[in-house]
């Protein structure tokens, strides 16, 4: 659920971000566009890349890129750096949604796969509603940069968990 979470968590920080970066409200709103366009485009490629290179490798690369992109956002000194960080977040944040579904198809079938995908869909439905609340809560204690540090830490935990526990589900001979 990192993709939907990354879209909405920072929304409560828009005014503070505009002030600190010396950016207009429109420029801050454009950070959503810089995120969503690569997010949508890469949804077409994550599956293809995982079919060719393996599921685990693509998930790990996507999470690593998301961590680095989140840190770039957190330490942005101008709106252009924030735009770049958001674009890189968008490129990488959909990897779990696409490749995760492929991994489920690799190992589960029928009712088992449907049950797991229903649980995943529930997480994707909850994330957009919960993430602005989380962002607002973080703003009580940190400035807007803390939200991106939080996203980097969250993705780092997922990255370590995947490194330790996530197996490759697509055998080399089945790769295309």
Model-derived features with residue positions:
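Flexible cytoplasmic inter-helical loops of multi-pass small-molecule transporters
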Residues: 163-176
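Small-residue-rich segments within alpha-helical transmembrane domains of MFS-like 12-TM solute carriers
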Residues: 4, 8, 74, 90-98
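Residue-level signature of the transmembrane alpha-helical cores
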Residues: 61-65, 69, 85, 92, ...
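Extracellular/periplasmic helix-loop-helix junction of adjacent transmembrane segments
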Residues: 13-41
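Conserved MFS/SLC helix-loop-helix module at the cytosolic interface between two early adjacent transmembrane helices
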Residues: 41-79
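Helix-loop-helix hairpin linking two adjacent transmembrane segments in secondary transporters
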Residues: 77, 81, 118-164
């Amino acid at each position: 659920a990192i993709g939907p979470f990354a879209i909405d968590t920072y929304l409560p920080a828009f005014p503070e971000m505009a002030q600190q970066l010396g950016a207009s409200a429109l420029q801050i709103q454009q950070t959503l566009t810089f995120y969503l366009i690569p997010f949508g485009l890469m949804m077409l490629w994550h599956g293809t890349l995982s079919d060719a290179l393996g599921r685990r490798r693509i998930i790990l690369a996507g999470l690593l890129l998301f961590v680095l992109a989140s840190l770039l956002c957190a330490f942005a000194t101008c709106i252009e750096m924030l735009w770049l960080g958001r674009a890189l977040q968008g490129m990488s944040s959909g990897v779990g949604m696409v490749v995760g579904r492929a991994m489920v198809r690799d190992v589960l079938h029928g009712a088992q796969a449907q049950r797991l995908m229903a649980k995943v869909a529930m997480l994707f439905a909850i994330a957009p509603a919960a993430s602005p609340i989380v962002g607002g809560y973080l703003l009580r204690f940190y400035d807007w940069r803390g939200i991106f540090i939080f996203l980097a830490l969250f993705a780092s935990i997922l990255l370590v968990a995947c490194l330790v526990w996530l197996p490759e589900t697509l055998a080399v001979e089945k790769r295309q």
